[in-house]
């Protein structure tokens, strides 16, 4: 898994309309509200659209399996739920992934993990994938309610997940050694932000 700083994030006005022309045959994962905003901007329609309702494992897999396999790409359109769902679909279908966030206050944009939840507890990982790139279209993001783009929760969650990714990667022998003192100081800083 690459770190957030290495993600290819492309910003601009009308970037979805321009960028989607190169997608070939693709499937999309979205939510009804996000799809309503982005669908009219797409260069050509997907071969299938999976609507995300929640992050329940059986729902994610059922939607994934209902989509065609003979495509070139998976595109996640929306906020955290749909972006995470798209990661699972791309992993299960062994396809590249492009993410199109409709809000920017979510860490799902830059983290390739999809947690497996049991109630309110993470019990495992459903998918791990790095996306090819992220398209942040200013016109799309501006259509979201202001509180969804200014909440800041995504920043805090990214900070926390960065610590856990560092710990996890160090255990796997990837990246720099985990330093408990630095991690504790960073975690305290994030706690102070929330307090």
Report residues per predicted region.
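Gly/Ser-rich catalytic serine loop of serine hydrolases
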Residues: 74-83
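Residue-level detector of flexible, active-site-proximal loop/helix-junction positions
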Residues: 53-56, 81, 104
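ATP/NTP phosphate-donor binding region
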Residues: 1-73
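A glycine/threonine-rich phosphate-anchoring loop and its flanking beta-alpha core
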Residues: 92-187
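Short beta-strand/turn micro-motifs composed of small residues
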Residues: 29-30, 78, 101
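Short glycine-/acidic-enriched loop or helix-start segments at secondary-structure transitions
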Residues: 37-40, 85-87, 109-110, 145
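Short Gly/Thr/Asp-enriched flexible loops that form oxyanion-binding sites at enzyme active sites
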Residues: 82-95
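Oxyanion-binding "anion nests"
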Residues: 188-195
């Amino acid at each position: 898994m690459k770190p957030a700083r290495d993600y290819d994030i492309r910003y601009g006005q009308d970037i979805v309309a321009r960028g989607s022309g190169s997608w070939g045959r693709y499937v999309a994962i979205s939510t009804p509200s996000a799809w309503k905003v982005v669908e009219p901007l797409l260069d050509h329609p997907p071969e299938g659209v999976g609507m995300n309702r929640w992050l329940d494992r059986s729902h994610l897999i059922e939607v994934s399996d209902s989509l065609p396999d003979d495509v070139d790409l998976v595109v996640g359109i929306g906020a955290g739920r749909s972006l995470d769902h798209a990661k699972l679909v791309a992993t299960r279908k062994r396809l590249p992934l492009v993410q199109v966030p409709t809000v920017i206050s979510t860490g799902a944009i830059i983290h390739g993990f999809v947690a497996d939840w049991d109630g309110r507890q993470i019990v495992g990982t459903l998918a791990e994938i790095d996306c090819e790139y992220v398209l942040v279209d200013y016109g799309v993001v501006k259509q979201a309610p202001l509180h969804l783009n200014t909440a800041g929760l995504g920043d805090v969650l990214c900070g926390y997940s960065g610590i856990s990714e560092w710990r996890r990667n160090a255990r796997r022998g990837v990246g720099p050694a985990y330093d408990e003192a630095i991690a504790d100081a960073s975690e305290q800083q994030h706690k102070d932000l929330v307090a």
